[in-house]
Amino acid sequence: MLKYLAKRVGRSILTLFIIVTLVFCLLRLMPVEGYFANYEKMTEVQIQAGLQSMGLLDPLPVQIVRFWKDALHGDLGVSHIYKVNASVTGILAKKLPISVQMGVYAMLLSLVIGIPMGMFMGRFKSRWPDKIGTAIIVLIQAVPSAVYYLYIQMYGTTALGVGLLFDASNWKYWVLPVCSMSLGNIAFYAMWLRRYMVDESNKDYVRLARAKGVSENNIALRHIFRNAMVPLVQYIPSAFLNTVVGSIYIESLYSIPGMGGLLVTCVQRHD
């Protein structure tokens, strides 16, 4: 188990290194004006001096090595346009907590709803709980996320009596974005847990338990459910990361001052 986890962590670190390095290289293809907030008012001498001070005139391999050296020491550089000369680490420290907090709430909600839903679907295979659950999953997966995000916002704001400007101090403002973020994972957990429970229910140890006279509820909860959860657990960390990363549109939709809005703003302003 430890060897497997170490291999997964190693692959994740390598993937992260490759992606970040590629993005770093692609950003170096950005036009020169993207590095300066007042580019139109600057002379050529000032532009070259600014590029030199930022180390952008050095060879690309030198820039990559310097970037990773600074990043490993917690220095991600400074913002050139969003907040001139402000530490990127400081900016992220202000924006990241609310995105992580919202991601945690969405993950907990998806587990609380998705796991029991999948368990009931697997326990009552081909019966009405399974059919209703399957219909809900198909609906969630078939409809584009942006569509039900907008419907949740349209009707939810009226039902809860909240405005469009996010207020972190009022719990009502957390309900709609958290529900929106959790829908995809609810369908994911329910679908896969249902599948794993159906697979487990056909194994020999289940037949043996039935032959011994163990009740179906005990078999489902104490044996099938426990074993079906084992392969599902490995997806929880990646699902959480996907939830946080996928919050970009939702944060923009609800004007949440988190990583999503920050990313959109910085991309639009070429920072």
Feature locations, PLM:
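Alpha-helical transmembrane segments of integral membrane proteins
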Residues: L2-K3, L96-P129, S145, A168-D271
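Short amphipathic alpha-helical coupling elements at transmembrane boundaries
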Residues: A49-Q52, R66, D70, G90, ...
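An internal, D/E-rich "acidic patch" concept
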Residues: L56-I115
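Generic alpha-helical transmembrane segments of integral inner-membrane proteins
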Residues: V9, I13-L26, V104, L108-P116, ...
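Membrane-water interface at transmembrane helix exits
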Residues: V23, L27, P31, Y35, ...
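Hydrophobic alpha-helical transmembrane segments of membrane transport/permease proteins
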Residues: L16-V65, G156, L160-Y173
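Residue-level signal for discrete positions within transmembrane alpha-helices
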Residues: S12, K95, S99, A135-A142
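Membrane-water interface segments at the C-terminal ends of transmembrane alpha-helices
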Residues: V23-M30, F67-K69, A135-L165, S182-G184
